């Protein structure tokens, strides 16, 4: 609710989506968007959106999906030890094996993609596992995927994170194993 208020205050068109969840919000935004490319990113000030030129350049070169890669550019205190050295690397390894892709940071919160190509994938995960679903479906479709380095800064928001490490990690792993979303 606060993110939507702040976005409106800065001139963004905010799309209201009835179903709760990270994936639901993004799918609703993708459907409502009007541009050729979509750059999505966490709104907690942990990413520098002035750096999106690299994403757009790769998309213009014909890549369907462009992933950010936080590793090598993580500010001190921006990611917990367990996420940096256990959760993200292990889930990304499982995703690389399952989807035969080189993406090393499956959970980077900033990425770009071709809107029409994304719509054609039939994305349906309502929760955090959407982050894995979109990579898996782009990889399986044969679309070209690029990865570019990004910096991760400390979270700048005042509120608490919506991330629930164990349940969300399980949902990602479950999607990788079964290739289907958990339905509520």
Predicted regions and their residues:
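Acidic donor-binding segment of Leloir-type glycosyltransferases
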Residues: 1-16
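Hydrophobic residues within well-ordered alpha-helices
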Residues: 7, 59, 138-140
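Cofactor-binding loops of NAD(P)H-dependent oxidoreductases
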Residues: 17, 41-43, 148-150
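Acceptor/aglycone-binding surface of glycosyltransferases and processive sugar-polymer synthases
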Residues: 17-32, 37, 49-128, 154-177
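Acidic donor-binding/catalytic loop of UDP-sugar-dependent glycosyltransferases
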Residues: 2-6, 41-58
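Catalytic donor-sugar/metal-binding loop of nucleotide-sugar-dependent glycosyltransferases
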Residues: 101-102, 123-126, 135-153
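A charged, well-structured terminal subsegment
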Residues: 180-184
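Residue-level signature of catalytic and energy-coupling elements of molecular machines
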Residues: 3, 29, 44, 114, ...
């Amino acid at each position: 609710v606060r993110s939507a208020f702040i976005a409106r205050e800065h001139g963004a068109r905010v799309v209201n989506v009835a179903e709760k969840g990270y994936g639901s919000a993004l799918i609703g935004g993708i459907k409502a968007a009007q541009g050729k490319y979509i750059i999505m990113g966490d709104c907690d000030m942990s990413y520098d959106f002035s750096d999106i030129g690299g994403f757009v350049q790769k998309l213009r070169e014909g890549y369907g999906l462009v992933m950010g890669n936080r590793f090598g550019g993580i500010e001190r205190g921006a990611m917990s030890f367990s996420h940096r050295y256990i959760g993200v690397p292990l889930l990304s390894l499982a995703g690389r094996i399952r989807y035969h892709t080189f993406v090393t940071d499956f959970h980077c919160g900033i990425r770009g993609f071709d809107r029409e190509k994304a719509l054609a994938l039939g994305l349906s995960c309502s929760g955090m596992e959407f982050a894995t679903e979109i990579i898996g479906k782009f990889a399986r479709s044969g679309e070209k995927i690029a990865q570019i380095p990004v910096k991760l800064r400390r979270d700048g928001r005042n509120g608490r994170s919506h991330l629930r490490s164990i349940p969300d990690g399980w949902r990602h792993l479950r999607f990788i194993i079964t290739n289907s979303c958990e339905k509520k």
